[in-house]
From Swiss-Prot:
GO CC terms, sorted: cytosol
Recorded metabolic or biological pathway in which this protein acts: tRNA modification; 5-methoxycarbonylmethyl-2-thiouridine-tRNA biosynthesis
Cross-link (Glycyl lysine isopeptide (Gly-Lys) (interchain with K-? in acceptor proteins)): G101
Domain of life of the native organism: Eukaryota
InterPro entries membership: Beta-grasp_dom_sf, Mopterin_synth/thiamin_S_b, Urm1
GO MF annotation: an example: sulfur carrier activity
Subcellular location(s) of the protein: Cytoplasm
GO biological process: protein urmylation; tRNA thio-modification; tRNA wobble uridine modification
Gene source species: Mus musculus
Modification after translation, per record: C-terminal thiocarboxylation occurs in 2 steps, it is first acyl-adenylated (-COAMP) via the hesA/moeB/thiF part of MOCS3, then thiocarboxylated (-COSH) via the rhodanese domain of MOCS3.
Name of the gene encoding the protein in the UniProt record: Urm1
Similarity annotation: Belongs to the URM1 family.
Protein name: Ubiquitin-related modifier 1
């Protein structure tokens, strides 16, 4: 069984508006059968943090195109994207690159 994890989740570039304007969250993820990965984290975020218009953040089982994801300041594409296994004290930053004009 995977141990509980504490991670920092941040939202920027306007994405924080979907989370009641709160940019930084200290998240305690409970222990579960399988290790926590980004895919599981997104499900948890949708259930526990996302306050409105989930279609602007989630598409299928991933983030919408136009949302940049950084894990410990590195592009998630370099780390396995949805399959990246979270470690205790990881920092995950979601930045919306889509802006109205």
């Amino acid at each position: 069984m995977a141990a509980p994890l504490c991670v920092k989740v941040e939202f920027g570039g306007g994405a924080e508006l979907l989370f009641d304007g709160v940019k930084k969250h200290q998240v305690a993820l409970p222990g579960q059968e399988e290790p926590w990965d980004i895919r599981n984290l997104l499900v948890w975020i949708k259930k526990n943090l996302l306050k409105e218009r989930p279609e602007l953040f989630i598409q299928g089982d991933s983030v919408r195109p136009g949302i940049l994801v950084l894990i410990n300041d590195a592009d998630w594409e370099l780390l396995g994207e949805l399959d990246y296994q979270l470690q205790d004290q990881d920092s995950i930053l979601f930045i919306s690159t889509l802006h109205g004009g």
